[in-house]
Amino acid sequence: MVSRQEQFEQVQAVKKSINTASEEVKNQALLAMADHLVAATEEILAANALDMAAAKGKISDVMLDRLYLDADRIEAMARGIREVVALPDPIGEVLETSQLENGLVITKKRVAMGVIGIIYESRPNVTSDAAALTLKSGNAVVLRSGKDAYQTTHAIVTALKKGLETTTIHPNVIQLVEDTSRESSYAMMKAKGYLDLLIPRGGAGLINAVVENAIVPVIETGTGIVHVYVDKDADEDKALSIINNAKTSRPSVCNAMEVLLVHENKAASILPRLDQMLVAERKEAGLEPIQFRLDSKASQFVSGQAAETQDFDTEFLDYVLAVKVVSSLEEAVAHIESHSTHHSDAIVTENAEAAAYFTDQVDSAAVYVNASTRFTDGGQFGLGCEMGISTQKLHARGPMGLKELTSYKYVVAGDGQIRE
């Protein structure tokens, strides 16, 4: 096993091969990575079967689905890499140019970060997405996968590096930390001078540990306690469609709804319909029904478990939904501000003033009017695959695409000027 220190030194030694690579060279590398990923389908699926067998009974079915790969999912990962090829290269973009009175010409130019570290949990597609985005944005990458997905991740990284071996980009610009212990995560948090940026992708425990302990600069990809508020002026059919999509289309992802807020004027009519749609109809269709966590007012209209205080602060990532009835738009916004992780929140209303108030007052990375929160995604936003959803305000916010993985520098051109 190569030590972490050796890996940090290896990636530092070769980072210039990607930091200064042309767009053509980077695109050739990405295409080779995609081709070799598909070519290694058999090996990747064999590794994934080992991870699935080891994880069964230890993690939820929803989380097992995150971990699971088949040939179609691997092809989708390769397709995601190829989509990055089609995106404009951000490196070298001139952001601003100005000329001073003394004749100096100052150009603000986009540049690579250098080496980016990614700590993430059991999602194999993050491996290929992260590699594609970092390389296209001119960065080398150090990956640290969760132990539940390690065999799969190792097989994916092996395929990606074999692709790079056919190009002029050194394969060591992609590094996979072989040690999946907690100590390896902490080593990355302290790797100042080796990592220029650290991005955690996972649950609240992982993200909080990185934010609290890292001395390397961090972009926080926060958890998603996502709200949908059904206003008194909502179209109920529209609201039910949005709720169904936001909760059930893929409950294990960070942009899935976790909390439903309903105006008291709508509760008596919409909550029984919601119960029919999310419980009775799903049972009839052989699907897992939604389990409700209800406040005292909501429990008057629908059956379910009484909500505990912590239910409104929980990212369930499962077929569980906390429901609260509120007396006003202002109460809904106040609840969101008290419990939100500032990821994605939505209002369903036909009232333009209510929509404007909600979008002005709710301080989240993405705020929706009459649309599902499931759109908070790099691909859906036209950014290609994403590095994560930033819930902080410094440097990057919302879906992080190529530009969010870059910095800038000033190039100052003169003709012998000196400062008096």
Swiss-Prot record:
CDD domains: ALDH_F18-19_ProA-GPR (cd07079). It holds the Pfam family Aldedh. Its main location: cytoplasm. It is found in: Cytoplasm. It comes from the Bacteria. Keywords: Amino-acid biosynthesis, Cytoplasm, NADP, Oxidoreductase, Proline biosynthesis. It is an enzyme of class 1 (oxidoreductase). One of its GO terms (cellular component) is cytoplasm. Catalyzes the NADPH-dependent reduction of L-glutamate 5-phosphate into L-glutamate 5-semialdehyde and phosphate. The product spontaneously undergoes cyclization to form 1-pyrroline-5-carboxylate. This is Gamma-glutamyl phosphate reductase. It comes from Streptococcus pneumoniae serotype 2 (strain D39 / NCTC 7466).
